[in-house]
Amino acid sequence: MRKFFLLGVLILLVSCTRTPERILSKVWGVNVKGLEYSVTSFKDQWIGNGDGETEIRMAVELPQKDIDILISHGAKPLPIVEPENKKRWLERISGIDCATDGVYFFEQGEQEQECKFLIYDDDSHVLYYYLSIM
């Protein structure tokens, strides 16, 4: 009986693993499975009280239907239209400078360190997603 319980817990833990693909699908509705892509960086660190951050960078050529899904979630056309200091910070953390073709989403949290940011550069085919909650 104990073996079945432990096996069940193990299966549950494996099925709940957060992957870049699952995060993008759940948060943005974008499904990269079936597309050619490579995850160049992934960080997903959270503590028990809910504070933490997620950062995903991937090389992927999104079809127009996925770009339309991002727009339906509030993404705006590039270039980034934010105050200059915020724009420079977003370009620096994403590594995507002066992009003009693609979409981005930025939402400031309640605290200065909190934000939700996504950018997709259609020229370089780079998708970057960052979420920070403190």
Residue spans for each PLM region:
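N-terminal export/targeting and maturation segments
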Residues: 16-72
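A general structural signal for short secondary-structure junctions and capping/turn motifs
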Residues: 2, 50, 118-121
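Alpha-helix boundary/capping residues
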Residues: 11, 74-77
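Sec-dependent bacterial lipoprotein signal peptides
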Residues: 1-14
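Extracytoplasmic electrostatic interaction patches
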Residues: 77-134
